Structure formats: structure tokens, C-alpha cells
Amino acid sequence: MQDKNLVNVNLTKEMKASFIDYAMSVIVARALPDVRDGLKPVHRRILYGMNELGVTPDKPHKKSARITGDVMGKYHPHGDSSIYEAMVRMAQWWSYRYMLVDGHGNFGSMDGDSAAAQRYTEARMSKIALEMLRDINKNTVDFVDNYDANEREPLVLPARFPNLLVNGATGIAVGMATNIPPHNLGETIDAVKLVMDNPEVTTKDLMEVLPGPDFPTGALVMGKSGIHKAYETGKGSIVLRSRTEIETTKTGRERIVVTEFPYMVNKTKVHEHIVRLVQEKRIEGITAVRDESNREGVRFVIEVKRDASANVILNNLFKMTQMQTNFGFNMLAIQNGIPKILSLRQILDAYIEHQKEVVVRRTRFDKEKAEARAHILEGLLIALDHIDEVIRIIRASETDAEAQAELMSKFKLSERQSQAILDMRLRRLTGLERDKIQSEYDDLLALIADLADILAKPERVSQIIKDELDEVKRKFSDKRRTELMIGQVLSLEDEDLIEESDVLITLSNRGYIKRLDQDEFTAQKRGGRGVQGTGVKDDDFVRELVSTSTHDHLLFFTNKGRVYRLKGYEIPEYGRTAKGLPVVNLLKLDEDESIQTVINVESDRSDDAYLFFTTRHGIVKRTSVKEFANIRQNGLKALNLKDEDELINVLLAEGDMDIIIGTKFGYAVRFNQSAVRGMSRIATGVKGVNLREGDTVVGASLITDQDEVLIITEKGYGKRTVATEYPTKGRGGKGMQTAKITEKNGLLAGLMTVQGDEDLMIITDTGVMIRTNLANISQTGRATMGVKVMRLDQDAQIVTFTTVAVAEKEEVGTENETEGEA
């Protein structure tokens, strides 16, 4: 038999209904602040309860347990711990920009220490908290019954300053959360006044007076673009960074000193995190971490090793610890009983409307009170003007009611006026008292007229709001604590975590690449080429050697006309004897694609620097280095190649320089680079040399009159010729003879300019390699055949050669070379 007290319900429907009720209760009545006073219900009840207890700044502190118990018993039946924790936060300087509670005792620390139990601590309202409740007894806000209908509590506080922005808010509701940063009081008040003076004001205009958040712990806000977006939309993110300085000790060592941490960061946890990073060797160069903070302020010291870079360590700390954090704006608040994400302008507008209502209701209350008092005084003045008749009526009456009725009938008085006459003391019958009553009455009439004028003129209401805000600003405003750094700051890149140093990049003929310390080789100018390679196989040699920096960019040009970009630190570091890493592991090269040239692009490269391209079919192109500033990971097309053409060489040309191009049939053309106009990256180029049928380009170099032109033929002949024998002519000619081509010496294998004191590395198509000094190669005329440089096996041909600078063995290690026949 079913119990009549049981009701069958659908579980799904009940869960939906109950959860919605619960969610709305949490959202509206617990977790989110009201846009008008910036308070959640618990904070509002704490302040109102303290005000009712009389725990004001001019009174002694009262036990926190007494305050908590009173608030819980009358207004907030949710447990004393939640009430006490909320009150503690309002008393912490690192949590609230302007504390609303003045705590006495242990109220915790920014290291995460908990406050003492509520039975040990004491509290009272702070001075600025009084401004939140000012005029609350003048019917400025609505009151409702408390949870048991035995008390009345305010729905919102008058809030004579914009507390939602000034102290911010954080809270997690059901399915939504709020995160509003604190701001400087003076700046926020200026923003309120700006909106009142100019309703058409933009977010950009507002940021002139309210540039951004002002956190109680100070620190730095990196960039303003995130602030503007958050103010415009209610959502956004900013980067907060610790305020640091690098000190140098008497012994010459460096130390990092942190004086301000980002908002809500626990510096004890930061300390523990740094120690853990050092132990795990994720950060190197730190010898000690100390927290020297005291009552004077925060001082967090990080000692740095003598040979370590404090700036690099600091950048690592910013990236790996909470010394740099993101603050996410989510300006969600209750407006008209509904949770909404609000822009800065909407928050200011809501506050202004609230203040207008407060001022109007207060003015109306004062006017009604003044009118009631004037009404009484008017009756007293009538009585004083007819005092003898009044006394006669009173004496003749047997009861108070009879006297009151007679007075009302005789002098046309109201019940309240007649009662006031009956209550009047005899001493007020004197002439002096009559003058006082008349003066008070006249003042009240003037006040009533003024209050009526305020109610009739909205502009006067606005002016009162601004005047009262100015008074709050005068009393409580202070200097900004958080510094706003101009310009947007991106997240820390890898190079910020790597110390800049000079290095050497080597690329072998077989495509092995590595990075070495500069000390591994003899010193060269950055961008230079040509020390011998080490650590390569017997059939390999270093074809490209570039002196650069770990922070500089390297451009890799391939035979297919594509370009790739790496920074110096992105190339793995190897020892001098290691062969390195195949370059295909770093660059996404096609199977038949190979690196032709490596160019160092220094960070301080001049604006007139150009890259000069030469293809096998004689096409040339000149393009500004700046065109290659942004290159994707999978490379970029450096020039358009046609008809199975391929890129031979890329030269870095600055200023007024000549170019020489050599062809397979033994011809060369020299012209000034200015003969080729600057072109875009995707351009095809123009004709640099007019090739004969079957001829191709085999080499191109920059040339000056102090250089020598080196040519090597496929059958092992070579020569050096002074550059002055190659006059500068126009672009696109067939060229002048640079070698006497015969069946004996073969076609040209290559052409390049040299200084004359380098070593020459030559390699054949069978893998045989020889190294010889250029002094062993005769200097002859332009149209000669040259001398035998390398004796080849039958059917073998020279395929490539390059120069390397001469270096002593003790500086570079053992040479790797395979001699050909003499």
C-alpha cells in the first residue's frame, strides 16, 4: 500500500529543476558581485553587520568571532568559516587594493600562511569602508527580509566609490566565473567623471585617465593591447611580470632581486619551484635563493654564478615560474538580477545610474524630513503668535484629546502640529526661543526649495555625484603601484633563454651541419667564410663556414630556388671532431634538393643589403634582404626558376659592388650590381649573361680590382688572373674569354674570386679530394689555358671546389684530406 505522503516524480525533470534552482542560487546569491557596489552577498552582509554592531574606525577593534557570529546569525546562515575567510581577505593588503576591514592580529601573509583562528583576531571597518555605507539610513537602497524574516538587510550598498573596479572581484559560480582586476581609486573616479561629462567617450579616451589595472602587489603589466580588448569586450588577457633588478656585488658577481610579484602569486611556492628547477638542472647558473622580505617590503634574492648571465636566467624564470603570469579578464557581474559580461563602459554606466538613484533617494528623504520638520515649526509659530489663546484653550480643556481637538479646530492645525504644541515646554515661550524657531523655519524652507531644485534638475544630481567622488578621491587616493609598460610584449622566445655568443656554423659537402664555439677556430669577422673543416669523413670537406651569433638568422638557399631560415642556436652544437647532423634533419628538403649557399643575416644588417641570385641558365636577380624577414618552417620560394633551371649561387651584396659570372665554355661577364634593379622575392629575374648554345653558368662572385679570378677546369687545370683584366661592362653580354678551352684541359668546372693566400679544396666525381695552397697555382693572363692543378684518374672529372683559409694545425686540429696524384 502506497504512503499518501509520498509523491512520485520524474527523476530527470526533478534533477533539471533542482539543479537550475541551485545554480541560480549560487550565481545570484553567493559567487558573483553586484555591478553597483562590487560586493558578493557575504561581503555586503559583513560590512552591514559591522556597521550595525558599531565597529567603526573610531571605535576599538572587536573580536572577529563576535562579528562572524553576528553576521551568521542575522544574515548569512552558511557557516562561520566562509564568513571569516571573506572578512580576512578584506583585511589583507595583498588581496584588496583598498582594504575594507582593519584587522588586528595575524591575518595571514602573501606567502600563503593562514590567518589565526577567529577567536584570536580582532577587526573593525576601515575608513574607506564607511563610504560604502554612507547614507544607508536615508532610504538610499532597498531592504529585504533576511533568511528567517526577523531582520532586514540591504540588497545593495550605497557605495560612494566604484568598488567593483577599485577592488576587483574573483568568484566561481556554476558554469561561469568572474575575474575583475583592481584599479587605482583616483584613476577610476576620473573615468566615472569623464563618462558623466562626455557620454560619447570611447574606450581609448577612457584609457587616457584609466590606463589599466593597479594591483595591490604592484608588478609590471606588459603591453596595453590586452587591456584595451578587455575594457572593450569584458574579456581579455594581460601579462604580469615581477619587478626585478640586477645587482652587482662587491666581488663582481650578479644577483637578481625581486621587489614585487604578480597579483595573487605565492612567493614561497615560487621559491620552492626555483629550487626544484635548479635541482632538475632545467635552469643553470643559480647558486642560492633567499627570501629577505620584512615589514619594509618584499626582497627576494636569487644569487647567480660568476660566469652565468643574469639576464638569461631571469628570462628563464619568467618563462618557467610564476614570476610572470597571465591575468585573464572576465568581467562578469550581476546586473538587474542577471549575470552579464560587461565592458568597462557598461560597468561605469551601471555605477553612475546607481549613484543617481542613491542621490535622488537621499535628496527625497532629506526633503521629506525637512518638510515634516517645517510643518511642525509652522504650527509652533502659529501657537506663539496666539500664545494667550492657546493657553486659554489648554486650561479650559479637561483632557489632552479635547485640547488637541480644540487647537486643530481653532487654528486649522494638523494632528502632528497640535500634538507638538501640547508637547512644547514653557521655556520656548520666550522671545529668544521664538526667534530661533523662526530662523530654523526659514532655513528649512530654503533647504526644501534647494532639494526640490535638485530633484527637478538631473545636471545638479550629476554635479553632486562628481563633488562627492572628488571628496573620496581627496581622502583616499594614492599613487599607482602597478607600472604599465608601453608596447605589447610577446611571450618569451627561445632566444630570450639562450645567451648570445659568437659561433661558427659548418656545412660539409655531403650535407652535415653543426655549430661550434668560436674558440674552436681562429678568429674571423662575422659573416666570414673558410676555415678547414674537421670531424668529416675522408671523402667529405667543409664547403660552407659562416661566423655568426646564436641570435642571428641564417638563410639556406637550395638549388631549386627555395630558401629556409634558422637561427644560430637552432643548429645543434657538436665538438670539433664530430661530423655533425644531416641538414635534412633540420630543413624539409626534397630528395633531389641540396643547399647551395648559406648567408648570415645579422640583426644589425644595413637597409641597403641585397641578395644577388645567379642561375645555371644565366638569369640574375637582386632582392632586398628585408624580403626574407618572415620565412615559414617549410621554406619559401626565393625566385622563380624556368625550363629546368637551377640556382647556382647567392651573394650578399652591400653598397656599390661588381659581379663576375663564369660559364662552362670559358667566358666571363663583369658588371655592376646596380645594372640589375631591385626585384620582389617572387620575381624571375633578368638575363645576366647571354649564353651560347649549350653553355651554362658554373660560378658567380663579388669582385673588386684587388681580387684575383680563379678558374678550375673539369680535367684538372687551373689559373689565377688579376681582376683588372676583367673590365666592367653591361649586363647581358656574351662575355669575354676567361680560359682557353681545349680537349686537353676540358670545360670550366667553376669560377670564383680569391685573395691569393687561401687553400684550395678540390673534389672529383669519383670522390677523390685534394688540398693545395693557391700559391702553387700560377698567375697567368685571362685567355690562357692554365697549369695542371690535379692529376685525375681516367674518365674522372672535377665537380666542385672551394677555398678555405689557412690555419695552423694546433689551432684547428688534424687536417682531413685525400691527396690525388701529383
Curated annotation (Swiss-Prot):
> Gene for this protein?
gyrA
Q: Does the record bear DNA-binding in its keywords?
A: yes
PROSITE patterns xrefs? TOPO_IIA (PS52040)
Which HAMAP family has this protein been placed in?
Answer: GyrA
Main location group:
cytoplasm
- What GO molecular function annotation could you give as one example from this UniProt entry? DNA binding
The EC designation for this entry is: 5.6.2.2
Task: Report which reactions are catalysed by this protein.
Answer: ATP-dependent breakage, passage and rejoining of double-stranded DNA
Sequence motif: GyrA-box, positions: 524-530
Q: What GO cellular component term, any one, is given? A: chromosome
Topo IIA-type catalytic domain: residues covered:
32-497
> In the UniProt entry for this protein, what further remark is given in the free-text comments?
Few gyrases are as efficient as E.coli at forming negative supercoils. Not all organisms have 2 type II topoisomerases; in organisms with a single type II topoisomerase this enzyme also has to decatenate newly replicated chromosomes.
Q: What is this protein called?
A: DNA gyrase subunit A
As for subcellular location, the record says: Cytoplasm
